[in-house]
């Protein structure tokens, strides 16, 4: 907490959550980079973030991006929460949960009935209604269609061999809406 001249602590400003803009990509990448280095999140090229900017929500305090998350629609009834991250000084404040719930509301507004994630943070997602799943969450017909996608996240969802190094240790989780 900041200390005003009186010596009394003041509350930090509550981050505002909004849709991302192209100008936010540098801030998103700066937030994600240390997590990608530790292999908590998948590293992505800048162009990938620009292509997906419309999928992102960001949390901002005083012009600084302190949180982000994306919702990627995979099929008529299924979307994935991706790249959910908060700044170290925001951990434990509930910001990650706020961003997640905004993404879930986006999914509902789109008519999606299930939200999926690949994560190491199972307790966090369990607190938000996600449950661990085994096997495929789609029919064989949808699986065959998804195989045609060029998106690396879809390949991870399908558990394809070529992306195994990205997903080792991750838990597949699903939330019905």
Regions found by a protein language model. Name each.
Residues 2-43, 60, 168-177:
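Short amphipathic alpha-helix that is part of the acyltransferase structural core
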Residues 84-91, 120:
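A short, internal acetyl-CoA/4′-phosphopantetheine-binding micro-motif in the GNAT/acyltransferase core
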Residues 42-61, 67-86:
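A conserved beta-strand-loop-helix scaffold within acyl/acetyltransferase catalytic domains
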Residues 30, 105, 123:
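Surface-exposed charge patches
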Residues 92-105, 117:
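Conserved acetyl-CoA-binding loop-helix of GNAT-fold acetyltransferases
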Residues 2-14, 108-110, 114-177:
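Terminal substrate-recognition subdomain of acyl/acetyltransferases
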């Amino acid at each position: 907490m900041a200390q005003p001249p009186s010596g009394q602590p003041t509350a930090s400003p509550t981050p505002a959550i909004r849709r991302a803009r192209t100008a936010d990509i540098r801030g998103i990448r700066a937030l994600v980079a240390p997590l990608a280095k530790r292999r908590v999140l998948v590293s992505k090229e800048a162009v990938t973030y620009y292509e997906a900017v419309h999928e992102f929500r960001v949390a901002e305090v005083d012009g600084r991006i302190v949180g982000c998350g994306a919702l990627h629609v995979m099929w008529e009834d299924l979307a994935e929460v991706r790249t959910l991250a908060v700044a170290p000084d925001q951990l434990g404040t509930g910001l990650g949960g706020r961003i997640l719930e905004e993404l879930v509301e986006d999914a509902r507004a789109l008519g999606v009935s299930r939200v999926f994630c690949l994560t190491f943070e199972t307790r966090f997602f369990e607190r938000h209604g996600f449950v661990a799943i085994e096997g495929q969450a789609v029919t064989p017909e949808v699986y065959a269609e998804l195989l045609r996608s060029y998106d690396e996240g879809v390949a991870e969802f399908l558990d394809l061999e070529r992306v195994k190094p990205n997903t080792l240790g991750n838990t597949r989780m699903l939330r019905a809406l």
